[in-house]
Structures are given as C-alpha cells and as structure tokens.
C-alpha cells in the first residue's frame, strides 16, 4: 500500500452522516472493514496499511467514532446498519468487494454477506461469527430488557474525562494494549465542559430488542456461500471451540485458524502475521473459488 496514513471519508446515507478512513489506491482490491462494539474505524489503523494491493475502507458504524448517532426513536440492533453499509458500498461504486469484520463488526458482516451474497466476494471474520442464540420463549424477557434499557440510557450523560490519558486508561481497563487504546480513544472523543467525553452513543450499551434463534443463526451461516476465513483469538473466542465448530457445520467454504493474542489481536504485536494470512486468503490461497 502507498502508506500508513489514512484518508478521511464522509458519506450521506439515509439522512445520516457516516465517517470512515481509507488506505491504499482506489484501483486496489476493494475491502470494506467493520469495527467492533464501542470501537471505530481506527481499529484497522495497524492492519490496513499491511494489506498489500487492497483499497481498504473502514467505516465508523452509526453511533461510533465520527459517524452520526441515530435519532431518539431509532435502535442499534445488529441489522440496523445494513442499509447504511449498502449505501456506502454503492456510493463507492463497489459492485463486488470483500468484507472484514471484528467482533460486533464480524457479526454485522455475516448478516450483510448472507443477505447480499452476490455482492461479497470473500468474507473475513475476526474473533466472532454470530451472537449467541436465544430460545424463543425468552422473547418477552428480552423485550423488557430492551425497553427499560432504552428509557434509562436516553437519560444518561456520557462520562467526562479531564484528560485524553484518563480516557485511554479507561479503555485499557477492558484489556486493550495502551497503544491500541489510544488509537481508538482519539477517534471516539470530543471536547466538552470539563474536558473530554465519548462520541459513542450510550444506547449502544443497551439490550437488543430481539435476538436470533438457533434456526435463524443456522440460516445465516448456510447463506454464506462465499469463501470465508474465521480467525479466532487464543485469548478470546478461541477459548470457546463450539463457536468455530458451529460455523464449520454450516459454512461450506470455511477456513478456521487460531491466532496468538487477545480479542483485539489485529491491533497487537502480531498484526503483521494477521495481515499476511488475510492477504493470502484474499489472493485465493485457501483453495476455495469465488462464485
């Protein structure tokens, strides 16, 4: 790629302003990157410059980073981002592209790829596939959690930090290396009276109104007909072998590998090895042909 410095991006989709970062030449292999819960596009700041030959566009999902928050009556269900993702790739002129997602972004990537398989050439999932399914009889309990959380979080003020270092320390408490925490925090903060506060929408911390059932999860996995690479963190979801086993049961063209590191392994010291594995997969070295 031409350099490590990203190019800021902005789009207007469905009345929402969406922000992002891009790396590489526009003529490169198109690769859309979706970050995890409470992260932002800077999640790919270390990985993207190492993906040789790719044009990487990392999106701040709604309510994260520099993208707009949704209106008070709206929600942050995992499928709510799909129309905006479709709008962004259409604005980019990408009829076919590859998709990489981390954590919540991996889950959203699975949903998008299963819904629009004709658009996704190859799929890369970093330490997540789909959310844990719930039994149908749990629907009333889940809906109650959603309604009460929404009422509570609409009235909640974001935490204020006196300094950038204070915000970085707060993210470090969640197990992130300091250098990675700083990258994410710098894009997730704005100035306010008394210092700095998050740009992330507090409602992202609330319960989902509806969760997928076992059969719905299975239908999503079966619809992932493109070559798919699942990289699991040894200190993350790699400790739950049933996640990969379930994916292997239903995704036909799946490659699963375990990666040394924690849940944010793509932001840790082994990022070069991760980039090498993803580059090889995008170049078709997994033996699976694209449809």
Predicted feature locations:
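Conserved serine/cysteine hydrolase catalytic core
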Residues: 192-249
